[in-house]
Amino acid sequence: MSVCKGVSGNPAKGEVFLYKHVNFQGDSWKVTGNVYDFRSVSGLNDVVSSVKVGPNTKAFIFKDDRFNGNFIRLEESSQVTDLTTRNLNDAISSIIVATFESA
């Protein structure tokens, strides 16, 4: 698991970009691997409003820590400009990032 603050452009394979505001604005983080509790990352818990997922990557984003509660699955190279549309705006507390090879 790795979380780095500050991103630009689009995520690579195995990466998910999280943004504090809608439309990929504000503070941002690059996540690789699973994070079971966003409270362990300063400033990240319950603040994410938009998401980008890299190629050959899927993300499972959970409302609660330890991969519990409501969640959404995001497919490779997908983008969500406003998590309000998924009832998870400013409410994400854990994530699973999975990579796969193309067929």
UniProtKB/Swiss-Prot annotation:
<feature type="domain" description="Beta/gamma crystallin 'Greek key' 2">
    <location>
        <begin position="57"/>
        <end position="99"/>
    </location>
</feature>
<keyword id="KW-0963">Cytoplasm</keyword>
<dbReference type="InterPro" id="IPR001064">
    <property type="entry name" value="Beta/gamma_crystallin"/>
</dbReference>
<dbReference type="GO" id="GO:0098609">
    <property type="term" value="P:cell-cell adhesion"/>
</dbReference>
<comment type="similarity">
    <text>Belongs to the beta/gamma-crystallin family.</text>
</comment>
<dbReference type="InterPro" id="IPR015059">
    <property type="entry name" value="Ca_cell_adhesion_N_dom"/>
</dbReference>
<dbReference type="GO" id="GO:0016020">
    <property type="term" value="C:membrane"/>
</dbReference>
<dbReference type="Pfam" id="PF08964">
    <property type="entry name" value="Crystall_3"/>
</dbReference>
<dbReference type="InterPro" id="IPR011024">
    <property type="entry name" value="G_crystallin-like"/>
</dbReference>
<dbReference type="GO" id="GO:0005737">
    <property type="term" value="C:cytoplasm"/>
</dbReference>
<comment type="function">
    <text>Structural protein.</text>
</comment>
<feature type="region of interest" description="N-terminal arm">
    <location>
        <begin position="1"/>
        <end position="13"/>
    </location>
</feature>
<protein>
    <recommendedName>
        <fullName>Spherulin-3A</fullName>
    </recommendedName>
</protein>
<feature type="domain" description="Beta/gamma crystallin 'Greek key' 1">
    <location>
        <begin position="14"/>
        <end position="55"/>
    </location>
</feature>
<keyword id="KW-0677">Repeat</keyword>
